[in-house]
């Protein structure tokens, strides 16, 4: 089965380049990348063209810059995706080399997958080279410590140990939820809930999508120690208390009324 990896980007060509390095290093290469672009300039197109020239399968889905419209461009990417199974991550998340393979291994009807991510500092994010990604140094806790990052229990996500991964996935107290940095589902399930709610602003919009999947009968499956990305640091210019409150109100309604289909999703794109 062909998989589609979907992630958004907005005028972050250097971060996008690092993310695409990660996808070029995957052990499972039977996938396409769908870049959901919320209005970036020509620098982003140049990065994508360079990755295409190196053999990575990419669709570039672009819409004009009209403020924060992440959910709208995600819905356009879902429509364009040619895979029957969709992996969602972000344009600031570099995948470990087994990222696609782990999602393929764990996917199952009636479930969506909840993967993990490890936050990098800004200095480490900026210093990350192609060789660091290809050689997977950015997933080694000792290398990160040398770059100034402190060791923590969260570093266990990076190990890639086939022995420990399933145990850690079962033992973690963290509930599996839809995390926009690293989650996946069948395309049919995403379409059944009408995709992402285009009314939502920055903050928790991915969780709302997952809550509707649960309302529709899907069970979340934990793979946060199996499928891993490292998260590049960045400013959050769209974040606001008002936006979080607006989204929280919609999420509360979704949970209370067990809503499955958003009234402002894929089906409304053409209207």
Question: How would you name each of these model-derived features?
Answer:
Residues 30-40, 59-64:
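Short beta-strand/loop segment that forms part of the nucleotide-sugar
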Residues 86:
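Short aromatic/hydrophobic "clamp" motif used to bind/position activated sugar donors
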Residues 64-81, 98:
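Glycine-rich, basic loop-to-helix element that forms the pyrophosphate-binding segment
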Residues 37-47, 93:
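A conserved acidic beta->alpha catalytic loop
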Residues 98-148:
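Conserved donor NDP-sugar-binding/catalytic core segment of glycosyltransferases
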Residues 21-30:
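Short, acidic, metal-binding catalytic loop of nucleotide-sugar glycosyltransferases
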Residues 181, 202-209:
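Acidic donor-binding loop at a coil-to-helix junction in glycosyltransferase catalytic cores
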Residues 2-4, 32, 208:
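Cell-envelope/extracellular polymer assembly enzymes that use nucleotide-activated donors
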């Amino acid at each position: 089965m062909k998989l589609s990896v979907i992630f958004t980007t907005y005028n972050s060509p250097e971060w996008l380049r690092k993310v695409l390095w990660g996808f070029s290093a995957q052990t499972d290469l039977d996938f396409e990348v769908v870049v959901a672009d919320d209005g970036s300039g020509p620098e982003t197109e140049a990065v994508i063209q360079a990755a295409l020239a190196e053999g990575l399968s990419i669709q570039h889905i672009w819409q004009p810059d009209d403020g924060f419209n992440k959910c709208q461009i995600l819905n356009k990417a879902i429509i364009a995706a040619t895979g029957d199974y969709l992996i969602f991550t972000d344009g600031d998340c570099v995948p470990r080399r087994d990222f696609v393979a782990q999602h393929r291994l764990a996917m199952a009807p009636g479930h969506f997958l909840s993967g993990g991510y490890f936050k990098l500092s800004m200095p480490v994010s900026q210093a990350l080279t192609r060789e660091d990604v290809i050689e997977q140094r950015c997933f080694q806790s000792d290398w990160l410590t040398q770059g100034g990052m402190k060791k923590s229990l969260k570093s266990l996500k990076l190990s890639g140990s086939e022995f420990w991964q399933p145990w850690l996935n079962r033992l973690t107290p963290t509930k599996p939820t839809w995390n926009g940095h690293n989650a996946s589902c069948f395309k049919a399930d995403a379409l059944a809930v009408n995709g992402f709610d285009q009314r939502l602003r920055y903050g928790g919009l991915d969780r709302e999508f997952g809550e509707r999947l649960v309302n529709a009968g899907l069970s979340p499956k934990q793979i946060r120690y199996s499928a891993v990305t490292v998260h590049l640091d960045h400013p959050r210019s769209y974040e606001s208390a008002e936006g979080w409150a607006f989204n929280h109100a919609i999420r509360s309604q979704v949970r209370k009324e067990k809503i499955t289909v958003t009234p402002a999703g894929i089906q409304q794109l053409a209207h």
